[in-house]
Amino acid sequence: MGRKRSASSSRWLNEHFKDPFVQKAHKQKLRSRAYFKLDEIQQTDRLFKPGMTVVDLGAAPGGWSQYAVTQIGSKGRIIACDILEMDPIVGVDFLQGDFRDENVLAALLERVGESKVDVVMSDMAPNFSGMPSVDIPRAMYLVELALDMCKQVLTANGSFVVKVFQGEGFDEYLREIRSLFKVVKVRKPEASRGRSREVYIVAIGYKY
């Protein structure tokens, strides 16, 4: 006998399938509505140009990589990583593994190689328990790891876009990013649900 869904999970599913961006993504055969979040950021901040090298953290199911491919073209390169499986995308070199694992990080850095990266993007999020006191620190740990990745691979004047959940540690994290990049904006794309704590920090012009 199947388990009954909780009221909160049933509400989430109902909201999810009624979401116009979910419906639009399905209609256009896109991986996820995250595609539209990155599109809106690109229209405003112009992160991507043809021929760029991009790292995509928390890539599955592939919405961001799918969008970035359309912007960087056949001469560009995307190295993507996620703990979950992801169906192949032409132009994307995908590594499945837990980014928190040092061996996975080493494998990712090996794929990047000697060349510097133009854009690091992170849509990583932990499995949420529903308790902010647990979830926010887990989420902050992931975004700190993404910023550490920037410090290792990002080219001078490179860019970083990262999903962050507002809560304890957010202001300090934003302050650190502002010390490393010339221009920093906090964006809330239309495709991001209004009641979600998520925002996107867009950082341009890496100083080092």
Curated annotation (Swiss-Prot):
Its EC number is 2.1.1.166. The keyword Methyltransferase applies. This is Ribosomal RNA large subunit methyltransferase E. NCBIfam families: PRK11188.1 (NF008390), rrmJ (TIGR00438). Keywords: Cytoplasm, Methyltransferase, rRNA processing, S-adenosyl-L-methionine, Transferase. It is an enzyme of class 2 (transferase). HAMAP family: RNA_methyltr_E. Its main location: cytoplasm. It comes from the Bacteria. It catalyses: uridine(2552) in 23S rRNA + S-adenosyl-L-methionine = 2'-O-methyluridine(2552) in 23S rRNA + S-adenosyl-L-homocysteine + H(+). S-adenosyl-L-methionine binds at residues 62, 64, 82, 98, 123. Belongs to the class I-like SAM-binding methyltransferase superfamily. RNA methyltransferase RlmE family. Specifically methylates the uridine in position 2552 of 23S rRNA at the 2'-O position of the ribose in the fully assembled 50S ribosomal subunit. It is found in: Cytoplasm. It comes from Actinobacillus succinogenes (strain ATCC 55618 / DSM 22257 / CCUG 43843 / 130Z). GO terms for molecular function: rRNA (uridine-2'-O-)-methyltransferase activity. One of its GO terms (cellular component) is cytoplasm. The gene is rlmE. The active site is at residue 163.
